[in-house]
Amino acid sequence: GDPDSKNAKKGQMLGQGGPDYTIAAEFKQELIHRKGALAAARMADQVNPRKESSGSQFYIAQGKVYTKDELNNLAARMGKQFNQTQIEAYTTVGGVPFLDYEYTVFGQVIEGLEVIDKIAAVQKDHYDRPTEDIKMTIKVVEQ
């Protein structure tokens, strides 16, 4: 999601590029960080208490599959409760439940979830950037 990543040199640190504007946070109960969720990156709460999203940077949620006990323990630590949609998603396809309603989710990978794991498994440099560029093509499908 960093616009500076296009044609970036090998080893160049990325993750700080983008426009000077942010987008208001938008949380919807049905849009959660299940595996494959497309979500907007943002600055930390300390400098961004309204949780406004980056104007261009995004990420794809990977996470893990949780047991019900793990979800219950996580919910207790967070002081929250997970709804049935979250429980179903995180105990089957997995994801990143602690990011729900903290970062705006705006889309979902609908085919090729296994590619997320392949991308996450490649060799990375000290900036956590793949040592070989991985080009993505994104197609918007409206429902």
Which ranges hold each PLM region?
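Cyclophilin-like peptidyl-prolyl cis-trans isomerases
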Residues: 1-143
